[in-house]
Amino acid sequence: MTRIGFIGLGNMGGPMAANLARAGHAVRVFDLMPESVAKAIAAGCIAAGDAREAVTGCDLAISMLPAGEHVRGLWLSEGGGQDLLGALPAGAQVIDCSTIDVASARAVGDAAKARGIRFLDAPVSGGVTGAA
C-alpha cells in the first residue's frame, strides 16, 4: 500500500484525498481548516497534527494550495519556510496540484531533484465536480 501525505483539503484537495482513501491507500492529511480535516477523516483519511507529520516518511506527498508562495513556504526553507522536502526519503514523489506560477514550480522541483526526490507539477482542471 502506498503511504500518501496530502496537504490542502479545500474544494479540490478534499475530494481528491477522499478518492485516494476510498481506493485503499493510507492517506495522512493536513489542512489549516479543522472542518476540512473532519470531512477527510469521514472519508477514511488519517488526520495529522501538522503538515510535517502528514508527509514524514511517505512514498508520495501531494499538495493542493492556493498560490506559489504557499507551495514554496511548504516545501522549501527559504524565508522561514517549513522545508518539508527534508521530511521525505530519497526516492519519494511530490505531486503539486496547485495552479501556481512557473518560477515557484521550478524552484520546488529543483530543490526536490537536489535531494533525490521526484517532483511533478500537476495543476488540475475540471473544477470541484472533476475532483469528486
Name each model-derived stretch.
Residues 1-64, 92, 128:
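NAD(P)+-binding Rossmann beta1-loop-alpha1 motif at the extreme N-terminus of oxidoreductases
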Residues 10-14, 82-87, 124-126:
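Short amphipathic alpha-helical segments, especially helix-boundary/capping motifs
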Residues 18, 22, 76, 110:
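Short, well-ordered alpha-helices that flank and scaffold nucleotide-derived cofactor binding pockets
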Residues 4, 9, 99-132:
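Rossmann-fold dinucleotide-binding core
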Residues 45-104:
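Rossmann-like NAD(P)-binding element
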Residues 30-32, 96, 121:
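Short beta-strands and strand-loop turn motifs
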